[in-house]
């Protein structure tokens, strides 16, 4: 069991998706990454020369994703950024290439004991993505250079808690993350 407590400490402390170099570490998991945080984690894991059964990536999304990050990204890169409603609640991002929905549902079922699951929007989507199972969306993690795609773990999930929810507290968000890990491990031990 390997636990990496915080891949992007500066981003966490400043409630910011970027690192001090204005790079999004979570979308920088590729060889020769310009994000030192991503490169260090890949080097650390790569040096182990291990196959991994599970990769679970614990995230939180705050309102600053739309109020600060997306406008700054649009200004910097001159690319229109579509803002979407940040879901009020917990949800998961599975790997589109291998979603393993029973694992995702086991995580959701455990988290439901602690906090609410993000509902879909009026189009039946969460952040613009289809929802194949309650509280679950899928991204191609390798193609997007996401943390969950760099190590070829058999099972993969990324959690998203929403600390800006009027019904959430830091304690609830932390308990939801613990419940997610517990749900994943319990599922694998069955």
Q: Where do the language-model regions lie?
A:
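Structured catalytic-domain cores with a bias toward divalent-metal coordination
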Residues: 1-190
């Amino acid at each position: 069991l390997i636990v990496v407590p915080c891949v992007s400490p500066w981003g966490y402390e400043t409630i910011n998706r970027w690192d001090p170099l204005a790079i999004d570490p979570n979308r920088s998991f590729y060889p020769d990454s310009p994000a030192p945080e991503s490169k260090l984690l890949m080097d650390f894991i790569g040096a182990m020369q291990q196959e991994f059964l599970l990769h679970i990536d614990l995230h939180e999304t705050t309102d600053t994703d739309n109020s600060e990050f997306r406008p700054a990204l649009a200004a910097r890169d001159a690319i229109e950024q579509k803002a979407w409603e940040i879901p009020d609640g917990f949800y998961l991002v599975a790997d589109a290439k291998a979603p393993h929905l029973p694992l995702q549902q086991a995580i959701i079922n455990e988290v439901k004991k602690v906090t609410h699951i993000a509902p879909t929007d009026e189009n039946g989507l969460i952040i613009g993505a289809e929802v194949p199972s309650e509280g679950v969306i899928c991204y191609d993690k390798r193609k997007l250079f996401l943390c969950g795609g760099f190590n070829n773990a058999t099972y993969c999930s990324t959690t998203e808690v929403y600390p800006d929810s009027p019904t959430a507290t830091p304690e609830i968000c932390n308990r939801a993350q613990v419940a997610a890990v517990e749900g994943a491990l319990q599922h694998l031990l069955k």
